[in-house]
């Protein structure tokens, strides 16, 4: 750090190191790339320590997996303890009501104010879509770090109906920062909440113009669909700087939004998690200086990040070299690709920084468009030539081509070519739920869903794939089936198949138009799955437990007995008799399976098993034959849980009246809900570009009026 910049770091200047999308644990089992995320995180923490920043600000996705491995958690805790604990004094204070900012924690205060901890580097972080709160208690990996006193987790939304973003108010000398944060929320849901004006950013009542308003968000910034992103215009115009996480391309130099008149900085990821063009940009973190309403962002290149080079090769652009009719054209293409890869390896060797901690094997990706009658060659044989020279030998070459859409009246026509090429060209990620939606949009009428909804199926598939909720699909089907049965019963429809099908179709179309009701259905179904999982026993039942259960069970026939028996009722499938019991005597005991007393009431297990296999037509049979359907409908589940990522559940939190009383208890922490008005030139933050990373700079020099022109 230059002497001129050091002289400007006085007692009124905040110094903040900004980073996002660290993705700890990415490819941790890979022999070559397994430590890349940990090495980059170590460098980020070391930069924060060396630059003596006031705190480290993370924009989400600290972990790559929702349930990080034991090794990943251990390394993360080691690094945080190494760099964040010490005797260096903290020179800023928190003015806001911390019980509101961190109210969802058992320790609702910043870690450096804990008398039992000695923190020298505070870390503030929101959660991302990879490490978002899930499960029965709506916990995430950041909550573990928060309970350990190493990270201050803020910006967590606790309601799916209305979001009030309360800032963490910080002061250093005469400089004051209102730090807003919003952890990852499904983009479609958050988009809808912004449109319905259900997102409110609270502001300090006193001296609104004296606060530097800094907002950390983790959402799609680029448009992936009509509502699958958050437009910058949705954000309040009183903001001065927005730190945008989730997008991996490094665009850390703040850019001005001419409509809202704030600046947006996109730090990008510190590790390449996909071989896309956006990840090939040089990785940086930012050293943000804030003094009063002025700011400066200094780009700091990361020197331990693995090099990544990507190129496109369109074979049809070389008609003089490649002729599809040539029998040896495939060998010529392979030779040409080898030359391209060798050239990229030479470039990587020249650009290597000489840092001993930087990985020596670069990532190489050559995307080959073989549209025009060409054939791909054997990529496995090709990869063997670069096993010892690249970090990703198995996927150096990626073949793709643009398929023509064929119009056939009697076939399902899905443009998979468009689906395949879009992620390659735009660096986007293909999602399973999008494939489900795309399939049913173009599928024939005879294979369309008649009872379930595409949106519900997509959400359940997402939970199954991303969150390992194995019962999500089953519970969704059961829930929507039960709801349809109740609807038909209330309508008193005759038990005729044609009429039932017509009513089911109308009911399904009605539910599709009511997105809020459908979201509630999905949340209820996933809540059932999580409640069922949280209540499932972790150990196998003993013989005594099994006998006690059998004494309570009463069924009418052997089929119901077999359906109601738990799958894990006995260890390793052994019969109730002793290990040495003769096979001729097994099952002949007076307390054998299925011989429970007939005059005892039926158990819940039997009811559930019977109701599970009931069809819609069965629901219209005489009530005396199906007593279990009502029991299933009466079963209640806890509704105290929320999952911010999957739009599936709700969380009970501190009542709004209590929160309001906390907010008004102190004049220094009171907030205003009034709508924000356009600010004058004097109250907005000033930004000064830093054209050269290596040059000395004055972050607080005066700017001309044209730099921050107002309306």
Swiss-Prot record:
Co-factor requirement: Mn(2+)
UniProt KW keywords: Chromosome, DNA damage, DNA repair, Endonuclease, Exonuclease, Hydrolase, Manganese, Meiosis, Metal-binding, Nuclease, Nucleus, Telomere
MF-aspect GO terms: 3'-5' exonuclease activity; 3'-5'-DNA exonuclease activity; DNA endonuclease activity; manganese ion binding; single-stranded DNA endodeoxyribonuclease activity
Ranges of compositional bias, category Polar residues: 599-613
The protein's Enzyme Commission number: 3.1.-.-
Gene Ontology BP term (one): metaphase chromosome alignment
GO CC term (a single one): chromosome, telomeric region
Key word Transferase present: no
Biased composition (Low complexity): 656-676
Main location: nucleus
Disordered: annotated span: 510-711
Record-listed Mn(2+) 2 binding positions: 61, 129, 218, 246
Broad EC category: hydrolase
CDD domains for the chain: MPP_Mre11_N
Sequence similarity: Belongs to the MRE11/RAD32 family.
Subunit description: Component of the MRN complex composed of two heterodimers rad50 and mre11 associated with a single nbn.
Name of the protein this chain belongs to: Double-strand break repair protein MRE11
Organism: Xenopus laevis
Gene this chain is encoded by: mre11
